[in-house]
Structures are given as structure tokens and as C-alpha cells.
């Protein structure tokens, strides 16, 4: 039985004051014990969040990292070892905003994925298609290719200590969301792709849905067989909304 995971990606949001308010709101939430919960603040606020949520069953992750574990001369980047030191347990890799806006290639994503695992943290591999790719019926090919880049380079066993998040790019921050059936189709295809190589890895792999997840839509999405939780964007900046999404995963 796969344990649900709900992860909040705060993206490039927050001041020390607003993050303190969000921490306080999260501390008030009754979170289901059967659901793993994580938040991904900006790197500037990681320490504040780790300290503020101490004793609360919420893991803290980083939104990105350098493609190396060790510290070194790489201005503006964060080595994975620094994230370990800061209290992070997970790291997002390959988020669509980094792929599309910042030009991160599959090769860069693979390098970051490997560095995160080498340091003992859990990578959350983001995959997804654009509106144009969906309209061209290329969704499964695009998503499958992004997943295959990691498997081909590191082996299917690399997914044993990893999470995959399917995020249809056309649904991120747009208010649009894939229907539960659309999301399930892609999640099932991801699991089937992994199962062709290792059935046990596939059965244990947690696959999250990320694309304008809201409390109102969460229960129906999470009710799908191959959807194991959510990577939540804007809604995670509201503690009550995020708490409701977490509770939906527990139901």
C-alpha cells in the first residue's frame, strides 16, 4: 500500500513575516497521520520553516539544487550537502518552470536527481506536457521520455527512493486542472512504463498530481487508483486550504 504524499511548492513567494504566518497556520492544522506532508519554501526561508515546524509531522524540501553534492565555486547555486545541512529531506528536480523558462535539459535533470540521491535525500521528479503537446496527442510520449531519461541513465532501481510528480504544464497556475480521468491515464502510463522494467518498483512508486490542485477537487483526484497525492502550488500558500487537501488524501 502506497502512503499518500501531499507536497506544497511555495515557489518564489514569501517574506519572513508571511512565512511566519504560514508556519503558524500549518501548526494549527490537524494533519492525517496516514499521509506524508511536505513543503518546499524558497531557499531563503528553508531554515525558518525547518525551525518553525519542528515537532510537526511536516517534511521540508528544496525547490532546486546544484547538480553536485559537494560545496564549491559555483556562484548562486546550492550544493545538495548544504541542503542536507539546512534540514531538507526532499528536493524538486525538473519542475516545468525550470525546464521551460530556464532551459534545463533532461541531462541536467538527471544530474540533479543523481546528486540528490547520492546525498541521501529524496528527489521529486517532475514530468509533464505543454498545451501544444497535449493537443498534438504527444502527452504520453513527452512524459515517458522525461521519465526514461532518468531510468536510462541511472537504472529503474533509482526510483526506489524517489517520487514522481505529473504536472500538466497547461494546468499550472491557470486555474485549469486535468480531469481525474485525464490525470489517471497519465499516472497509469507512468506506472506501466516502470512496471515493464520492474513490477515491484512500479507498485511502490508514489506518483503525485500537480496542476492547480484545490481542496474542492482533491478528493476526486486522490480517489484515482494511480494518484498517490499532490504537488500543490498556489493553494499551499493558504494553510487552511492546504490542510484540507492533506485531509482529502487521508480519506
UniProtKB/Swiss-Prot annotation:
Substrates-to-products reaction catalysed: D-glyceraldehyde 3-phosphate = dihydroxyacetone phosphate
Chief location: cytoplasm
Subcellular location: Cytoplasm
Enzyme type, top EC level: isomerase
Record-annotated active site: 95, 167
Protein name: Triosephosphate isomerase
List of residues binding substrate: 9-11, 173, 212, 233-234
Pathway of action: Carbohydrate biosynthesis; gluconeogenesis; Carbohydrate degradation; glycolysis; D-glyceraldehyde 3-phosphate from glycerone phosphate: step 1/1
Species assigned in the record: Ectopseudomonas mendocina (strain ymp)
CDD domains assigned: TIM (cd00311)
Superkingdom, taxonomy of origin: Bacteria
Organism lineage: Bacteria, Pseudomonadati, Pseudomonadota, Gammaproteobacteria, Pseudomonadales
Amino acid at each position: 500500500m502506497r502512503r499518500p504524499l501531499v507536497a506544497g511548492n511555495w515557489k518564489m513567494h514569501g517574506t519572513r513575516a508571511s512565512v511566519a504566518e504560514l508556519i503558524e497556520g500549518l501548526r494549527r492544522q490537524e494533519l492525517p497521520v496516514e499521509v506524508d506532508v511536505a513543503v518546499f519554501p524558497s531557499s531563503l526561508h528553508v531554515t525558518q520553516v525547518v525551525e518553525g515546524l519542528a515537532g510537526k509531522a511536516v517534511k521540508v524540501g528544496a525547490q532546486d539544487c546544484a547538480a553536485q553534492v559537494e560545496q564549491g565555486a559555483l556562484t548562486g547555486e546550492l550544493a545538495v550537502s548544504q541542503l542536507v545541512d539546512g534540514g531538507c529531506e526532499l528536493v524538486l528536480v525538473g519542475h516545468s518552470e525550470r525546464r521551460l523558462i530556464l532551459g534545463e535539459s533532461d541531462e541536467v535533470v538527471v544530474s540533479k536527481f543523481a546528486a540528490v540521491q547520492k546525498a541521501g535525500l529524496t528527489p521529486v521528479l517532475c514530468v509533464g506536457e505543454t498545451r501544444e503537446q497535449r493537443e498534438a496527442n504527444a502527452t504520453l510520449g513527452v512524459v515517458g521520455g522525461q521519465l526514461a531519461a532518468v531510468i536510462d541513465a541511472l537504472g529503474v532501481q533509482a526510483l526506489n527512493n524517489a517520487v514522481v510528480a505529473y504536472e500538466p504544464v497547461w494546468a499550472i497556475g491557470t486555474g485549469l486542472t486535468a480531469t481525474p480521468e485525464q490525470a489517471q491515464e497519465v499516472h497509469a502510463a507512468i506506472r506501466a512504463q516502470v512496471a515493464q522494467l520492474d513490477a515491484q518498483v512500479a507498485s511502490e512508486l508514489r506518483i503525485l498530481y500537480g496542476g492547480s490542485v484545490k481542496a474542492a477537487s482533491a478528493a476526486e483526484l486522490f480517489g484515482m487508483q494511480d494518484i498517490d497525492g499532490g504537488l500543490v502550488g498556489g493553494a499551499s500558500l493558504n494553510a487552511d486550504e492546504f490542510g484540507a487537501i492533506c485531509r482529502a488524501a487521508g480519506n
